[in-house]
């Protein structure tokens, strides 16, 4: 059998703490909704920068490498 380490003991305690338990009600839905919306906003901003429809002062987008 392998050695017992403090890190292994900590990770095992964290990993097994909620095993088999379901949070009643909405659970993690609100948190995941917020994270999803933030990701969507981030991707829309990236798309607007790529399409140059979002103009940033002092920031030029040149895809030719010039």
Curated annotation (Swiss-Prot):
Keyword Calcium: no
Subcellular location as annotated: Cellular thylakoid membrane
Domain of life: Bacteria
UniProt similarity note: Belongs to the PsbH family.
HAMAP family: PSII_PsbH
Function comment: One of the components of the core complex of photosystem II (PSII), required for its stability and/or assembly. PSII is a light-driven water:plastoquinone oxidoreductase that uses light energy to abstract electrons from H(2)O, generating O(2) and a proton gradient subsequently used for ATP formation. It consists of a core antenna complex that captures photons, and an electron transfer chain that converts photonic excitation into a charge separation.
Quaternary state and interactors: PSII is composed of 1 copy each of membrane proteins PsbA, PsbB, PsbC, PsbD, PsbE, PsbF, PsbH, PsbI, PsbJ, PsbK, PsbL, PsbM, PsbT, PsbX, PsbY, Psb30/Ycf12, peripheral proteins PsbO, CyanoQ (PsbQ), PsbU, PsbV and a large number of cofactors. It forms dimeric complexes.
Protein name as annotated: Photosystem II reaction center protein H
Native organism: Prochlorococcus marinus (strain MIT 9515)
